[in-house]
Amino acid sequence: MIIKPFNAVHIGLFVFAAAVIMLLYFCLSRTKEKTRRWVIVAICIANIVGFLIYKVALSHDADFLRISGIVRFNWWNELPLQLCNINMFLIPIGLLTGRRSITGFSFFVAPLGAVMALVFPESAFCGYSLFLPRMLGFYGTHIVIFICGISLATLGIYRPRLGDFPGIYLTLCCLAGGAHAVNLILRRTVCPFANYFYTYPADISILRLFWRWIPCPLLYLLPGLLILGAYMLTLWGTFALCEKAGASFGKHHKK
């Protein structure tokens, strides 16, 4: 089962994700919100464990090193500090602390980061069997992040608001700036190719395009803010329409 962007296996993965999101909704929609929160937290914890197993397997994958052009596996380059996998921690933190700003960031950014990773994978994760350990780890962890992010809204834990957008942008910019600082430190010490949040150009088609437009570390990601804005508006509008339709249906049903 070879997987690459938009082939049958790749599309099937997103169909599977949609099915899981619907299943979670039908199984949990009538439960207490506390129960729904803990289910999402438990899924994230399981995903963190899976992520660690995936990285251990990756550290022994000679093919991954060859394709990526890396001489030796470096754990400092595999920390969960990317735009998508950092949400494995942010989602539980937001749910357990009740911080709306964190939960809102995870709802909008976690699915987008996961989708970007899955649609524009690095060379080592494109065109190989889905059943290779590194492929299962990469696609598995990202699809679970996508499911958890979307489920924050479908389960009624978080309701998107336009007023959340400025805080989400601020949070993203702070995290990106912090990631770039981490990259600068690691590149000068223990990991010369550290690239969290991809603040330096990477072997990803859309990022290569951004770099051609703005050949400057960190700043070359600015076009991504436009994509994020369009994505957030789309999600907000979709959920607003669904809520309105649901309310109208409920009102009509009562009559």
For the regions a protein language model found, what residue spans apply to each?
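Membrane-interface transmembrane-helix boundary segments in multi-pass integral membrane proteins
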Residues: 1-16, 163, 167-169, 174, ...
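Hydrophobic core of alpha-helical transmembrane segments in multi-pass integral membrane proteins
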Residues: 10-29, 44-55, 176, 180, ...
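Alpha-helical transmembrane segments in multipass membrane proteins, preferentially the mid-helix core
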Residues: 20-26, 90-91, 144-163
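Membrane-interface helix-boundary motifs at transmembrane edges
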Residues: 27-40, 96-104, 155-166
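Aromatic-anchored segments of alpha-helical transmembrane domains
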Residues: 46-56, 110-122, 172-183
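Juxtamembrane "helix-exit" motif on the non-cytosolic side of transmembrane helices
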Residues: 54-67, 119-130
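Non-cytosolic membrane-interface motifs at loop->transmembrane helix junctions
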Residues: 65-80, 127-140
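Membrane-proximal helix-loop-helix units in multi-pass membrane proteins
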Residues: 95-149, 153
